[in-house]
């Protein structure tokens, strides 16, 4: 058994002539979603595949064996349900609605511009037909979406690992210290002719003028 522990997504970076000379191995989706499996390539060699946990193998990927040989993966045809919109009783939007309901059920879906593909399920097939969609069982390769956060998954045939994103380091730039807050000076309160609230603040009172009158005696 030849051990395989490396996968090159879509053979990125390899010379086309090397990929063309590589042996092939046909795998259905049930096997390709596993990180550990045995398979037999086109040369009759038994492969023991041990990939990082969570890795999804796609058709077009290239496996690298411990002896340096390469094996191109072919997604083998398998029974799937092909779902299309019914132009007579529905609209293309029905596919979007179907993808939403299938996603809520965590059903693996292959998304195409004009159709969807899922693994056979008679209950889901009846539900989709009730939504005015056309459902046919066919034999085709199945490449469902891997999920935005799946480890090692590359559902669109390119290697996201080659992109470099520089992280924004908040620890390396200095922020000027904030200026101390200055207490706002209250504005003078002005009462206009339309002011309707009462004057509850004190006004300075002027001192009262006291007048003293002397009383004349009655016998005068």
Swiss-Prot record:
GO terms for cellular component: cytoplasm. Residues 178-188 have a biased composition (Low complexity). The keyword Electron transport does not apply. Residues 156-177, 191-206 have a biased composition (Basic and acidic residues). It is found in: Cytoplasm. Residues 145-220 are annotated as: Disordered. Gene3D superfamilies: Urease metallochaperone UreE, N-terminal domain, UreE, C-terminal domain. Pfam families: UreE_C, UreE_N. One of its GO terms (molecular function) is nickel cation binding. GO terms for biological process: protein folding; protein-containing complex assembly; urea metabolic process. It comes from the Bacteria. The keyword Cytoplasm applies. Transmembrane segments: none annotated. Keywords: Chaperone, Cytoplasm, Nickel, Nickel insertion. Involved in urease metallocenter assembly. Binds nickel. Probably functions as a nickel donor during metallocenter assembly. Belongs to the UreE family. NCBIfam families: PRK13261.1-1 (NF009751), PRK13263.1 (NF009762). This is Urease accessory protein UreE.
């Amino acid at each position: 058994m030849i051990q395989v522990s490396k996968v090159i997504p879509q053979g990125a970076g390899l010379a086309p002539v090397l990929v063309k000379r590589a042996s092939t191995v046909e795998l259905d989706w049930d096997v390709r979603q596993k990180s550990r499996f045995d398979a037999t390539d086109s040369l009759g060699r038994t492969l023991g595949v041990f990939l990082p946990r969570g890795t999804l193998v796609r058709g077009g990927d290239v496996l690298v064996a411990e002896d340096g040989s390469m094996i191109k993966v072919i997604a083998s045809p398998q029974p799937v349900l092909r779902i299309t919109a019914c132009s007579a009783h529905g609209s293309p939007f029905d596919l979007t609605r179907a993808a939403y309901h299938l996603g809520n059920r965590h059903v693996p879906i292959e998304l195409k511009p004009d159709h969807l593909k899922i693994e056979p399920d008679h209950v889901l097939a009846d539900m989709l037909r009730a939504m005015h969609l056309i459902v046919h069982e066919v034999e085709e390769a199945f490449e469902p979406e891997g999920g935005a956060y799946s480890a090692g998954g590359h559902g669109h045939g390119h290697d996201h690992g080659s992109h470099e994103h520089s992280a924004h380091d908040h620890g390396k730039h200095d922020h000027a210290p904030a200026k101390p807050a200055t207490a706002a000076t209250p504005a003078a309160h002005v009462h206009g002719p339309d002011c309707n609230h009462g004057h509850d603040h004190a006004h300075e009172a002027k001192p009262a003028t006291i007048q003293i009158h002397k009383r004349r005696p009655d016998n005068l």
